[in-house]
């Protein structure tokens, strides 16, 4: 019997298939999210919700439908910014969930003490990436957007501090300078870069200007508390910006921050699509808004419908089987005892939260809703901000994910947190399309198993390596083992770069995801093999064995296939994501008869050998 040299799913997404764009295909995970979104939207727009919390959501919904252009609350905020001390205005915006010169979140401290502390996050650019600020046409579109914003806020929000040209110039100057110090995608994922901390008193000595930080954060921190920050360059830039920039110029940027926060809910929406890659529509805004502000309620509704105890138990067992396989592999490998100990402890201490995460808000303080939509939003933002602020100085709970909002179980997004060494598999992914207790295990390992294994292997990807078993940052492996492991990971990246026609920037952006895709596929397949109890060699597999194991790869491709890749996705394009990891799995060659003349062949010397059989 002749076996095909490629995966058995019509080869629609194969990078070696010239017809890969001939047909459309549906991404299962996107389909799941689309179905959930439709159900949640139908629930939100239903007239018959009769519980107390749901009624608040309905009042909020109706205020959205009837939102005014001339909201009194905006005129008050604008007047405050125009007439008050700049630092007071920044604090007011922060307390009401509006990012201006920085954002503030609460996050686990990455070193001793293991407590929650505030994290200062540099502002998000208006354009999609820092590279866009080198594009003349993109800058023209941004200037036009700022101009439209000025026209809107002078007409409806009673803004009158500055003329139009000065407003545009001040905002463009801040945006352009900010683009120079904004982190790259690779840096944003690197623990060495984004996890920095100082004691509060030390932070003030280094970065405070004219009591800026002390007046804004001082009421929340004691001198021995820590401040975490993601971008040292930005803090240095901000220090100079505050020293040398006129207060009116700063105020112009604060007003623009209001536009960035609320413009999506106004007539400015049509102009947003001039400065973003992915078009924004009213349906997205509507559902994202309710997820953000009423996610705690919608999650309860969702869990009531879709919580599946048996599937959770199945995945939990799969998780421990994968951890056992992974641990045994590294115990048997040729690393030093020091490295083996570090890896073993990290795997042992790897935890999973499945279904919904356990952080609960104090709903007794949840605000009542009124008729003014924008006032409702500010009340909600203030509520969530102060709920998170209460955690400062408290001990880390590894099962809490959404202390800054988000990470709800109805969002199709598995996640690994390197600082707590814990992964999250939401209820949304525990779907009949990814796991069925009625079908052969091989399909489940090819689908939900690869998702789970992908997140597990983030703990040992290029960034996960930087966090040790004690959750400190800075790899503690034996140096020779560390270099050997990294050299093997580079094989995955070099392969990815080749498939991207040597577009190195594109590959670097997806670097950790490519590693976790490849090693996750290996881990799931080899864990399944340990249950299947067969050694994969060309001469000891029957035809039935091959047909059976091919189901794993069929399930893998059915889960991730998608031609129309999202430009904002951190992962590789789907036609690469599906196929590239297979080239590093020797068993794939045996099962499909892949030989050197085939385009999906990779020389054995160029394949990653992590998780391969130890001779």
From Swiss-Prot:
Zn(2+) binds at residues 454, 458, 513. The keyword Zinc applies. Keywords: Hydrolase, Metal-binding, Metalloprotease, Protease, Zinc. The active site is at 455, 517 (proton donor). Its cofactor is Zn(2+). The keyword Nucleus does not apply. It comes from the Viruses. One of its GO terms (biological process) is protein processing. Binds 1 zinc ion per subunit. Residues 1-611 form the Peptidase M13 domain. Induction: Expressed in the late phase of the viral replicative cycle (between 6 and 9 hpi). Pfam families: Peptidase_M13, Peptidase_M13_N. Its EC number is 3.4.24.-. GO terms for cellular component: plasma membrane. Zinc metalloprotease. This is Zinc metalloproteinase R519. It comes from Acanthamoeba polyphaga mimivirus.
